[in-house]
Amino acid sequence: MKKEKDKKKKRDQKQAASQAARQDAQPAEDSRPLDYFLSVAGGKWKLRILWALHQESPARYRALRSRVPSITDMMLSQSLRELTEDGLLLREQYEEIPPRVEYALSPAGASLAALLEQVAAWERQARR
């Protein structure tokens, strides 16, 4: 009986130590830039939208929809909203009838688009 209590006590201590170690664990210092990049530009559509605006900016919603094949209206509007909130896009709404909204790359978005140019150059070399 005493052996079982001792085993249970040791097991509980190990579990407590393991939980404390997990709580203290933080992402590795060198993974933080990648984590941030993936949080603002990750996903299936955001980089495609940034690339489309890099090719021709500013652009209206329908123009972006035609330049990003097979994206749904819901995903395009959600991605545009998130990219704007994260500071990668600028949204300009004109007080006209009918209403007009244009999206353009912000300075942060333009610097990311420059990196996409390097990715495109890498792709051309890798396919040879």
Language model features with spans:
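N-terminal leader segment of winged-helix/HTH proteins
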Residues: 1-41
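N-terminal helix-turn-helix DNA-binding core of bacterial DNA-binding proteins
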Residues: 28-75, 96, 102
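A cross-family signal for key residues in well-ordered alpha-helices
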Residues: 35, 51, 78, 114, ...
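Basic amphipathic alpha-helical segments that dock to polyanions
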Residues: 76, 80-83
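A short, conserved structural fragment
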Residues: 84-92
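Basic, amphipathic "hinge/linker" alpha-helix immediately C-terminal to the N-terminal HTH DNA-binding motif
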Residues: 95-116
